[in-house]
Swiss-Prot record:
<dbReference type="GO" id="GO:0003735">
    <property type="term" value="F:structural constituent of ribosome"/>
</dbReference>
<keyword id="KW-0687">Ribonucleoprotein</keyword>
<dbReference type="GO" id="GO:0006412">
    <property type="term" value="P:translation"/>
</dbReference>
<dbReference type="GO" id="GO:0008270">
    <property type="term" value="F:zinc ion binding"/>
</dbReference>
<feature type="binding site">
    <location>
        <position position="55"/>
    </location>
    <ligand>
        <name>Zn(2+)</name>
    </ligand>
</feature>
<dbReference type="InterPro" id="IPR022845">
    <property type="entry name" value="Ribosomal_eS31_arc"/>
</dbReference>
<keyword id="KW-0863">Zinc-finger</keyword>
<protein>
    <recommendedName>
        <fullName>Small ribosomal subunit protein eS31</fullName>
    </recommendedName>
</protein>
<comment type="similarity">
    <text>Belongs to the eukaryotic ribosomal protein eS31 family.</text>
</comment>
<feature type="binding site">
    <location>
        <position position="58"/>
    </location>
    <ligand>
        <name>Zn(2+)</name>
    </ligand>
</feature>
<dbReference type="GO" id="GO:1990904">
    <property type="term" value="C:ribonucleoprotein complex"/>
</dbReference>
<keyword id="KW-0862">Zinc</keyword>
<dbReference type="GO" id="GO:0005840">
    <property type="term" value="C:ribosome"/>
</dbReference>
<dbReference type="InterPro" id="IPR011332">
    <property type="entry name" value="Ribosomal_zn-bd"/>
</dbReference>
<keyword id="KW-0689">Ribosomal protein</keyword>
<keyword id="KW-0479">Metal-binding</keyword>
<dbReference type="Pfam" id="PF01599">
    <property type="entry name" value="Ribosomal_S27"/>
</dbReference>
């Protein structure tokens, strides 16, 4: 019989909670990452080999200066 894994200590936030910045004073939350200007999907930031924002859906890339 398989045994259950031991319970993890401390409560982890859901993964989606790490995608937003929450300002409790103003009661506002906003998305941390950029949205693609071409298709509206979420863009990922890559540091190597050159810092850039890249959309995995449509392939749009915006290089940092």
């Amino acid at each position: 019989m398989s045994k259950k894994a031991p319970a993890k200590e401390g409560k982890k936030l859901p993964r989606a909670a790490t995608w937003y910045e929450i300002d409790m004073e103003k009661g506002v939350f906003r998305f941390k990452n950029k949205l693609c200007p071409k298709c509206g999907s979420v863009m990922a930031f890559h540091r190597e080999p050159v810092p850039r924002w890249h959309c995995g859906k449509c392939g749009f890339t915006q290089f940092q200066r």
